[in-house]
Amino acid sequence: MRRLSILTVAALVGTCVLAQDAALAASGAEKLGWQMSIHAYTFRKFSIFECIDKTAALGLKYMSLSGSVNLDGTNTVTTIKLSDKDAEAIRTAAAARGIKLVNIGVVTLPPNEAESRRVFEFARKMGIDTLVAEPEPAALDTVERLCKEYNIKVAIHNHPKPSHYWNPDTVLEAVQGRTPLMGACADTGHWLRSGLDPVECLKKLQGRVITLHFKDLVPDEPQAPTTAPATGKKKQSESKAMHDVPWGTGVGNVKAQMAELKRQGFHGVFGVEYEYHWDNSLPEIAKCVEFFNATCAELAKSP
């Protein structure tokens, strides 16, 4: 298995993230009650152990697991089906780098209680307190019971149109009257792809945002529409084609999103799920880290 040393990864970053002023992040993000994490899907072309190395090289202390894990750089395994040996190897590697695993997702939580219980059991075994999921409506009562039993949060994630939870109104409907352990995993990039204003979406979800897949995007270059072979008609996607860019350089108005989360008194994780330049996204993610730290420092100074 190919492993990258911290120094090797730091050199790849191209900016001296490891030498950033630690006080900048501490006095800003920590004062606001915020943490920045890497979502493992960001480095899906690499092994989970390389993902841990890259997270540490970025100077980050938090990471989330995706629904499947790449153990050796080639083969993936459904995360909740990891063997005890592999699960412990991941926990040990993260702990050795000073990294806390904060959530898993997107995971499947079906109405079948035994199947959903296995997911909660795995989260407890890994010391993880949040599951990111898109439960079908019929599963919500089961999910609520298990949240209370395990004291584990479930954050409902939004994919773009036409997925069930693309609109925050649907997320609110799902959690209305339920335990505060149930809320939203706000994927701000998918809101943009669905033609929604992330700031307005966050306002709707006030008090129910548990965690975020935080993104800044720009539209893809226009392409000719494809033709559906059966009908000969032009295929039109319901969501916009967009891709990730360093935070603060896209159309997401991310500073206003962060200001809104501060206004709400949000405490939690800003997850980096960077889905562009898969082979060498580290330099761009380093710019996201710099933006996050600088913006946190700025917001923490204001009343």
Feature names for model-found ranges:
Residues A10-L18:
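Hydrophobic h-region of N-terminal signal peptides that target proteins for export
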Residues Q20-D21, G28, E88, T92-G183, ...:
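Active-site acidic/histidine proton-transfer and metal-coordination neighborhood
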Residues G73-T74, H164-N167, P222:
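Short, charged, surface-exposed secondary-structure boundary motifs
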